[in-house]
């Protein structure tokens, strides 16, 4: 018998404490939704729930359409990782974990346009990649942060403007409404 888990008792209200080390490793924060499953072998399985993950196929199609229309890289994320990516460099972004700096931008709950020369330019993932501009728009569902829509530009001759910023905000709004 292998010992890979941690034993916890259930209290009178049916609650189980998830150890801090596991919460930190899996990036589970207070208030995060968890799905509870059971299997035939009497196992209880907890899975971190991602509302944007439920829209995986739609998010992929939408990201691809936006990327072709705007000629840039498009990422659709939940609060932890890139769910869908399209355009130049999508393979290096797909399913990558998001940076802590991006999570802070999400907390501002607004659409931002940043250039790589700006001091507050944010790396999308922990691996820094070469982009000259970015637009970050937060997906809100029933007032909660569900993820983000991110436009990235590698070509330094092309620049994002108000139109692209409105596209990102509109895309985030549409996806947020799909989740509600």
Report residues per predicted region.
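Short, small/polar residue-rich loop motifs at catalytic or cofactor-binding pockets
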Residues: 3-4, 68-71, 131-133
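Intrinsically disordered, low-complexity terminal regulatory regions
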Residues: 7-85
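Short, positively charged
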Residues: 47-61, 111-120, 173-174
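Juxtadomain coupling helices with adjacent low-complexity linkers
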Residues: 56, 60-65, 98-103, 148, ...
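Structured interaction and signal-relay segments at domain junctions
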Residues: 64-126
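A short, aliphatic-rich beta-strand micro-motif
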Residues: 133-140
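Glycine-biased flexible loop/turn sites that connect beta-strands or occur in inter-domain linkers
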Residues: 143-144
């Amino acid at each position: 018998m292998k010992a890979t888990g941690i034993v916890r008792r259930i209290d009178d209200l049916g609650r189980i404490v998830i150890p801090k080390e596991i919460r930190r490793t899996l990036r589970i924060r207070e208030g995060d939704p968890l799905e509870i499953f059971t299997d035939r072998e009497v196992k209880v399985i907890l899975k971190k729930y991602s509302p944007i993950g439920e829209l995986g196929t739609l998010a992929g199609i939408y990201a691809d359409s936006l990327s072709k229309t705007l000629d840039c890289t498009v990422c659709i994320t939940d609060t932890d990782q890139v769910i869908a990516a399209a355009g130049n460099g999508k393979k290096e972004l797909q399913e990558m974990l998001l940076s802590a700096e991006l999570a802070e931008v999400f907390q501002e709950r607004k659409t931002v346009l940043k250039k790589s020369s700006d001091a507050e330019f944010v790396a999308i993932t922990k691996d820094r990649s070469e982009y000259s501009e970015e637009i970050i728009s937060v997906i809100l569902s029933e007032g909660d942060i569900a993820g983000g829509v991110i436009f990235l530009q590698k070509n330094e001759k092309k620049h994002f403007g108000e139109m692209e910023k409105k596209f990102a905000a509109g895309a985030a709004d549409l996806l947020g409404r799909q989740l509600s």
